[in-house]
Amino acid sequence: MRKVVSLMLSLVLTASLLTGCSDNKTSSNGEVIVYNWGEYIDPEVITQFEEETGIKVIYDEFETNEIMYPKVEAGASQYDVICPSDYMISKMIENDLLQEIDFSKLSNIDQIGSQYMEMSKEFDPENKYSVPYCWGTVGILYNKTMVSSAPTKWADLWNEEYKDNILMQDSVRDAFMVAQKMLGYSMNSTDKDELEQCKNKLIEQKPLVQAYVVDQVRDKMIGNEAAIGVIYSGEAIYTQRENEDLEFVIPEEGTN
C-alpha cells in the first residue's frame, strides 16, 4: 500500500512537494489525489493550482478522522496527500501509513510560525511526516435568544432545559473530550475506569440531544434549529457572521 504525505488539518499543494512523493505515480501521470475535510479548501484554489502546475487534482472529502482512517489503512484508494488531525497523525505514524516529507522541496516552509512547528512535535516528534496549516479549538456555540443564561461549563450540555435543542459532534474523539473535560480528566486518558465513566455520561445525555452532527451544526445553529451545540472555533466565526444571535464560549474546564 502506498504511503501518503500527511498534513495537519491542511493541504499544501506545490509541484515540489508532489515530486517528493517518490513512491507514488504522481509525477508520471500528472495528477495528485487529495483526501481532506469537507469545505476546507476553496475550489478556486484547486483550479489555480492546476492552472499554474499542469497537475490534475483528484479531490475527495471526509467528515471525521474515524471515517478517513480505515479507508486509508485498507488501501482502497491511493491518496497522495491527506489532512488528518493531530492525534490521528500519531496513530498513522505508529502504523507506518505515512511517508516522510522532503522539506528541502518546500520553498515556503519558513513561512510557518515556529511555535506551530513546535506544537506539532506532540504528535510528530521530529516533524518528519506533517506540516501544520491551521490551529483551532472546540467550544460551545449558543443562541442568545434560546438560552436562559450563557453556558460556562461543559455540564451545560446536560441541562434538561435544552432537551431536543442540543447538538453534539458525531465524532468519538470530540464527544469523549466533552465528557472527559467535564469530569476533570485528560482528553488523552486511556484509563478504563475514566473512559467508562465518560461513556456513561454520554449515554445519560443522549435523550437530551437533538442530533449528532458534523458540518450540519453550522447550518442548524444559523437557522435557529437548535439552542446550543459543540462546534469548532473556525466554524463558530462563520456562524456568527451569518446569525448575530450566536455566541461562542470556551468552557471553564478548558478544551482540546
Positions of the model-derived regions?
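Short, flexible turn/loop "capping" segments at secondary-structure junctions
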Residues: T26, P132-C134, E252-N256
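A ligand-binding cleft/hinge motif common to bilobed small-molecule-binding domains
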Residues: M88-K91, A227-D245
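Periplasmic-binding protein-like
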Residues: L195-E204, E242-N256
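General small-molecule cofactor/ligand-binding pocket signal
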Residues: I58-D60, Q210-Y212, E247-V249
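Extracytoplasmic ligand-binding site segments that recognize negatively charged/polar headgroups
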Residues: Y35, Q78-E225
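Early extracytoplasmic/lumenal segment of secretory-pathway proteins
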Residues: N24-M92, D219
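Short, catalytically relevant binding-site loops at active-site mouths
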Residues: D174, V217-D219, I228, G234-Y238, ...
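Short, low-complexity disordered leader/linker segments with a strong preference
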Residues: M1-V32
